[in-house]
Amino acid sequence: MIVGIGIDIIELNRIEKMLDGKLKFMERILTENERNVAKGLKGSRLTEFVAGRFAAKEAYSKAVGTGIGKEVSFLDIEVRNDDRGKPILITSTEHIVHLSISHSKEFAVAQVVLESSSR
């Protein structure tokens, strides 16, 4: 049973401006593992990576109904890729999490669907 749905869209140029010489932004948004992946990226690929993670975390927080804040922070949520490249969301939730991330020339978008783990 679906228990939550969240979606977020972000302009890539907004993330690009925040990344411009601001390591603190990445430290606030990305987990250590995500920052390690980001170190190998440059230019538009780095912007897309960070924007996709930002959107995924915002979408998750909306799906759980809290938004980013006291109950859920950016660092409580990690986005990884499985063996086939599919993004997966790692968090402490008891729900099954379905995540989709997409990019265009100007935007990154993510959708999260939370499914009850009891069937």
UniProtKB/Swiss-Prot annotation:
InterPro entries: 4-PPantetheinyl_Trfase_dom, 4-PPantetheinyl_Trfase_dom_sf, ACPS, P-Pant_transferase_sf, Ppantetheine-prot_Trfase_dom. Mg(2+) binds at residues 8, 58. GO terms for cellular component: cytosol. Its EC number is 2.7.8.7. It catalyses: apo-[ACP] + CoA = holo-[ACP] + adenosine 3',5'-bisphosphate + H(+). It is found in: Cytoplasm. GO terms for biological process: fatty acid biosynthetic process; lysine biosynthetic process via aminoadipic acid. Coiled coil: none annotated. Keywords: Cytoplasm, Fatty acid biosynthesis, Fatty acid metabolism, Lipid biosynthesis, Lipid metabolism, Magnesium, Metal-binding, Transferase. The keyword Cytoplasm applies. The keyword Lipid metabolism applies. GO terms for molecular function: holo-[acyl-carrier-protein] synthase activity; magnesium ion binding. Its cofactor is Mg(2+). HAMAP family: AcpS. PANTHER family: L-AMINOADIPATE-SEMIALDEHYDE DEHYDROGENASE-PHOSPHOPANTETHEINYL TRANSFERASE, PHOSPHOPANTETHEINE TRANSFERASE. NCBIfam families: acpS (TIGR00516), pantethn_trn (TIGR00556). Transfers the 4'-phosphopantetheine moiety from coenzyme A to a Ser of acyl-carrier-protein. Belongs to the P-Pant transferase superfamily. AcpS family. This is Holo-[acyl-carrier-protein] synthase. It comes from Bacillus cereus (strain ZK / E33L).
